[in-house]
Amino acid sequence: MALETEAKNSNATATSDATATKASGKAKETNNTAGGKKNLNPIPNSNHQNSNQNLVNGNGTAADGPAAKKKGKKNRNKSPPEPTTEAVLSNGHAEKSTLVDAVEDNADADANANVEKPEDGGAPDAEADGEDIDLDALQDVGITVNISSPGADLLCVQLSSMELVQEIHQLLMDREETCHRTCFSLQLDNATLDNFAELKAISNLEQGSTIKVVEEPYTMREARIHVRHVRDLLKNLDPADAYNGIDCTSLTYLNTITQGDLLDKKKTRPDSVDCTPPEYVTPGVSEPPLLPLHPNVKNAKGPQALKVLTTSAWNPPPGPRKLHGDLMYLYVVTMEEKRFHISACSKGFYINQSTDDTFNPKPDNPSHLSHSLIDLLSHISPSFRRAFQTIQKRRTMRHAFERVATPYQVYQWASPTLEHTVDAIRAEDAFSSKLGYEEHIPGQTRDWNEELQTTRELPRKTLPERLLRERAIFKVHGDFVTAATRGAMAVIDGNVLAINPGEDPKMQMFIWNNIFFSLGFDVRDHYKELGGDAAAFVAPRYDLHGVRVYNAVDVEGLYTLGTVVIDYRGYRVTAQSIIPGILEREQEQSVVYGSIDFGKTVLSHPKYLELLRQAGKHLKILPHAVLNERDEPVELCSSVECKGIIGNDGRHYILDLLRTFPPDVNFLKLQDVQLSKELVDMGFPIEHRHKLCCLRQELLEAFIEDRHVSFIRIAAVHLQQLNAKKQSEKAEGNPVPALEGAEAVSKVNGADKTDVKEEKNEENEKAQSTAGDTKTAEAMVNAIREAQSNVATSNEVQAAEVVKRACAAVGSLKEKEFDFRFNPDVFSPGIRHVDGEEGTCSSLAKQKVLVQEAAEFLVLKQIPAFVKEHMTHSSPPIDGQSLTESLHSHGINVRYLGKVIKILNQMPRMDYLHRIAVLELIVRATKHIYYTYMQNTEPLHLSAAISHFLNCLLTNGPVNPAVSSEEAHKKRGNGGKHNKHKSSKGGKGQQQQQATGNQNGSSSGSSNGSSVSDWTLMTPRSLWQQIRKEAKVYWDWELDCDSIETAVSKYGILRISLLRAFCLKVGIQVLLREYNFESKHKPTFGDDDIVNVFPVVKHISPRATDAYNFYTTGQAKIQQGMFKEGYELISGALNLLNNVFGALHQENGSCLRMLARLSYLLGDAQDALAIQQRAVIMSERVNGMDHPSTILEYTHLSLYSFANGHVGMSLKLLYRARYLMVLICGEDHPEVALIDSNISLILHALGEYELSLRFIEHALKLNLKYFGDKAMPVALSYHLMARTQSCMGDFRSALNNEKETYSFYKSQLGENHEKTKDSAECLRLLTQQAVLLQRKMNDIYSSGKLTSDLPPIHITPPSMGSVLDMLNTINGILFVKISRKDIVKVRSEIEKHFKADSPENEVNDAISSIVAAANNNGEAEDAVPKDVEEQKEAGTQLTNGEKAAATEATSS
């Protein structure tokens, strides 16, 4: 029997309530316990008994990929994983000790694990030694035990001795034979095991011991849990929860598209493949349909087992029945239309004699008592028995990733019509104020603040401690986000009582489930000087940025609040954990640091100064002094608005972090600031509607990095000049006396370079070009620095002068030291600064200039760098979200989008990016208007108002907002909390309407009656006028269209893309059907087309630091060509990510994608397919089914499918990827060219030449547009087209196209290159065939009949091997053939360079040697993967990891 175990749950016993939460079997963690967050994950053992077992998430070992193979195929190209000595981490994951060694071997690369938190104590080396001991202590071999359950076969499982007994419970609740049991204990030798004991603590547990499952008597709580579990099992296949956005369920359609598990499929013969593409996938589709987005919707739901399962109206049991053991009553209607009343007692469940009208709790005759409700229902209903077996089979057939809950809820923007069934448990959940089972934990409600802070206080000195800490932080944070989201929706829906109900509704605050909620309005004129409600609306978002960066710095002793920002139904709600004691006193008494009135009164505190100074080093915040109301200087290490409050628990909290970073002077009109001429010419400064605009952290890091490179270069030049001068003076060869300059530079680098190193990692790509220019200069500075340690010198003045001049040139705050920090209060109104001496870092003028220069750097350097980077089209944005992420990674705020669009507009090769940017700007402008519009809409008319808004946005047809007769009859007054928010919406509504020129005549303070009709006055014309005005006011960009028609014709925007982007941005769910946007007779959207509104949630994302370090080290290895070492490290990263985040997470998906690519490069296509399949499912579930990452995963999977012989599946996957691409951004995109090239090549291989030609023609058109006619993709497209046309017999066209390829290769690569020779040979053959054909045709024309002696024309279809080679080439994977002789030659070359100490040229020479070997047509004895194109993109971000590939082949 195959050995099985389960992956440990993401929450150990770290949090204060984890034990109780586990005991209660919380619904979110178990994903309704049908799939469970746990999954059955075989751990490899020494005799490889599990080689054919399907690995669920590969989080066990470094050999994640190979272990996942179904066929037990031998791993030829990778050293097999060591089967012995597994290090079992504290949560039961098996981890190879080799991974730990890898961390220690790469101590230098991983040292930055603690760079951000020096207070952890000790250097990385010391920590590595400490870890070594701890990890030895963790060594464990696992225990094999037998589990005996009533009515089931003996089950043999392998477990880690570090696991809890509770894990066996979860394992049994996941298995098909035992899933219906919830109330049982586990006994060993008649002694009951403690659920929360580790297995190794059980003295008499040995290899081969048998653990008995013993049914326990029910309590009221256990009976309720059992009924809920049965309900969850029955609706396990129903996608309704995913569409409704509950319980962290989400959709995946990979198995629908591939019609089952790809790994189980046999290879298909090319002639048996149905390859005809659907009409909406072929090139030339104008508006893609919506229905294919959710394939197979009708058959998604499983068979129905029961008509009704609900709690009975006879509940609760009366006193006499309680004394007989009755716990609760259930009511069931079977598929046979039989009605039963069921009693739950301590022994189990039985049918009683009650009816709908009569209460008779006595057992029915004959009585049948079952401990499991499933057994009882199977006994009374044959239909139930059959349906339940079918549901179970289908449940267990699904991939484990389809059953696990996601970390955060993913919402669908389109949904089919869902059947609303009777469900008492759902009804109970909706009206209970708690989450799942949490009301049953000790203390009733959770103390979120205590949990969040306790987890951050956990020890973090060793790897197991850090894993436990990060897992606990992630677990509590995920629960907090879920609770905060639910609470925010309850607040806006009017289900929560305000804590200050007597005040104006927009000033009301709420507490629900120990979370504090406030609305995004300017309460008590706090933001009056900063922009009123506009400032109050954006402040929570900036505050969240502040919380994120302070959490990332992770200073011990400094605490931030749990913060979540939720946008729902047009309102912004901020949810925060509550500081202990804050509600018992006034804010004035609580604050011991900072200011509560924007700088009029300012306080400071020595402990806060100490803590914030530590954080400020990393965040580049300059300590500065301001004057308080008594004109006394007060020192601050943050912005004035940042408040420090010491809670009743003694912790030091900081809050209101909205001005963590310096202001953006390009969007502030200030008296004492004169911008440069270039900026003024570009229209700056632009007066924004609020004064909270600040620069991004990424920009400050890039700016400092840029200045540091300049500093090094300038210092080196001056040193060189000084050096030359001294040498000319002292020709006798004495040591150069000017080396103190190097000492000063050394001091600079010692003080600040460590921080800049971190930034270099973040800005890896950007800095490469600049850093390359300065390598010589840096080498010289380093050489001088080394020399100065050996030579005593006296000429310090000149050396100091060198550094001083370099500092002055780059604008350093200090005269004699490289120092770039920013004062966030430097332009804050009403704050009086203490001005220091000119030339020192406390000089206010210098601080102001520095902030101005950073803002100028954004416009003059970063925006052009962003555009230049995307001109290569190597990783082009696909939608607004990926565009925004790319902008942010360059430190560019979205408010600069108008300026970016102006630059893109002048570049035809950036047409696709221009279109995506315009679409994003329109969506964001519309969002601003929509929020105001929604706040002035009654709850009664929400669906009518939203459908009317969509009609105005997307159509030019009739938009008369007919209020339905049903609603017309509901003449109600001012009911519900929402109405109160609406009616008082003077602030943001009024202010934004004035700013956007709201044409619909609404007045925010209007009476209820007028505001109801307010939304009905909007027309398409008025809405687009508002959008144009908003684009000008907010982004300083002229939107040259006044209707959707002109937007479509002028900018090429697809309406379906606009609908998708807008729905995702504001949280609308529309009905899944085809929409006729051109309809002239009736509105496109009706009331019934608005299915739901969902919250848009912003929160921080906790990081897994050790996994991140593994990943970046692995990337470095891959870039050096060490694929096997890289594979092990990336597997280690995945292992650690599974420890911290559980099975599903975005970063896990990035690791899987990278592992699949590595497996493929190492020649194991089957392994690549297995891993990539998991990556696709994970991306669909975690990112969304139409997310750009999902499209990328699909294209990778199609390549690996083809390599495994699944030709038809490969096409289906590409069709899916192409459909999603066109739906999101249209056909005019560089990625569509790549997908079309792949589709064309596979269709060509299948003999579908006409279809193939359509796709390759489209790809060629796009490649010519975006790459120009002198680019490799264009040459490849011409070649593919020539191949297809030759197979169709059109030799003349083929000849012309191949000539284009040949001329490109000849001009770019030279005549002797292998590709040029291949193309020349192809031309020769085509010419030969063309001549033959022409002769044949001439003969026919001359004689009028066909002669039999003419030689036949041979059209040989390409072999699958040659097609795969071409697919690899298209997708940027080149296998360079090298002989053993060449490898020896390369190695000796590199050794020579090592001896010569010139590492800069090492990689270049190695590459040139390899290329030379390739050009010499060496023997094909060894294949070294080479992906030069993608190497440039290899960043340190997990999301870009798959781009990294090797350019150095020395590891071969």
Curated annotation (Swiss-Prot):
UniProt key word Cytoplasm: yes
Modified residues (Phosphoserine): S272
Single GO MF descriptor: mRNA binding
Compositionally biased residues, Basic residues: 68-77, 970-985
Pfam families assigned to the protein according to its UniProt record, in alphabetical order: CLU, CLU_N, eIF3_p135, GSKIP_dom, TPR_10, TPR_12
GO BP of this protein: asymmetric neuroblast division; intracellular distribution of mitochondria; mitochondrion organization; ribosome localization
Keywords: Cytoplasm, Phosphoprotein
Chain ranges of the Clu domain: 426-668
Intracellular or extracellular location(s): Cytoplasm
Chain spans, region Disordered: 1-93, 266-288, 726-775, 962-1013, 1414-1452
Bias type Basic and acidic residues, positions: 750-766, 1423-1433
General function of this protein: mRNA-binding protein involved in proper cytoplasmic distribution of mitochondria.
Sequence similarity: Belongs to the CLU family.
HAMAP family, sorted: CLU (MF_03013)
Record protein name field: Protein clueless
